[in-house]
Amino acid sequence: MKKWKKFLVLALSGVMIAMALTGCGSSSEKSDSDAKVEDVSTRTVYVSPQWVNAAQNGKVKGYKNVKVFEVTYTGKLKDSKSYKKGHVPGAMLIGDTDVEDAVGSQEEPYNLLKPEVIEANLLKHGITKDTKVVLYGEDPSGVARVAYGMIYDGVEDVKVLNGGLDAWKDAGYDTETDVNKAKAATDFGVAVPAHPEYWTSMTDAKAKLQSDSNFKLVSIRSKAEWLGKTSGYSYIDRAGEPEGAVWGKGADSAADVNGYMKDGKVVDLKTLQNGLWKDVDFTMDNHLAFYCGTGWRACVPFLICYQEGMDNISVYDGGWYEWQMYGDNPVQVGDPDSDNCQHTTVSQLPTDKAAKN
């Protein structure tokens, strides 16, 4: 009899614990589903973890089939330690090399791939122009690069989990280690690139600097890069900026966009206008062609402006890396507003300005 009573007590205890745990789970789910998330438009890029969670759970109208991707450089599992360690549930892998070349030659200076190649790569990931995409990753500029490439090619609704996986976990959401794979799509749904106006070539940049007073070539580089003290990169020997460029600030090195972020999250345009961009040599009425060294950092301010509905924006994709490959390209070294700025050509630059790793 005592054994039976002991068994009964243990059984009841187990039921109570299970109910308590179930109750906790229900409460969390209810709070997520009832919590108000931000309103978004198709062109909204940066979204909260709460919004992503709600979309994944079918709680956001129009986003029931959202696809989440973690961005790593190659998008291959063997190279993606962060993904293997733990990722947003349901997230698949995609790489920067799905949208840009990895060659680094004069013919392929880390620019976007040909639009047809981007299209083919996106289709392999099940992405068409109508796919609702959410991206995140460890490098905010690398994530922005993929988002920019998708928008350029024609994906109409691309979101970025602002703050990445850290923000996701800080919001109390779980991660998983399951490897999720996409089902390929066959029809992208639009001729590519859908938005060629968002991409500026070196030839176009040179021509517009000469002929279009409304065109501003905006450097998203560190102060040391802007002033020509360093190239910022171990594989670029020359330092300087294209003649006529203006400074958009925002980086402490070639590997960050710190000025465009606060508390690990990308800021909005109003914050930029009231802070970093309060005293710059361009306005929102100019055509703004952002550039950096090889294209990653420039994509962050592009997306910030894009989500505000601006269309007078682009990325000069080749950046300083491509510009300094051509000896006759005009260059400025130093602050162009000062008397100390040197105006020369690439061929006359010293070749000892590579960054020391």
How does the language model describe each region?
Residues A35-D39, L112-A207, G293, R297-Y321:
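Thiolate-centered catalytic microenvironments shared by cysteine-dependent enzyme domains
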Residues A102-K129, K249-L288:
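Helix-loop module immediately N-terminal to the HCX5R catalytic loop
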Residues V37-P49, A102, D166-E243, D328-N357:
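Active-site neighborhoods of enzymes that stabilize oxyanions during catalysis
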Residues M19-G23:
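C-terminal motif of bacterial Sec signal peptides marking the signal peptidase cleavage site
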Residues S31-T74:
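N-terminal module-boundary/linker segments of secreted carbohydrate-active enzymes
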Residues G25-S27:
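Bacterial signal peptide processing site
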Residues K265-M325, N329:
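Extracellular low-complexity, Gly/Ser/Thr-rich intrinsically disordered linkers
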Residues M1-A11:
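Bacterial N-terminal signal peptides that target proteins for export
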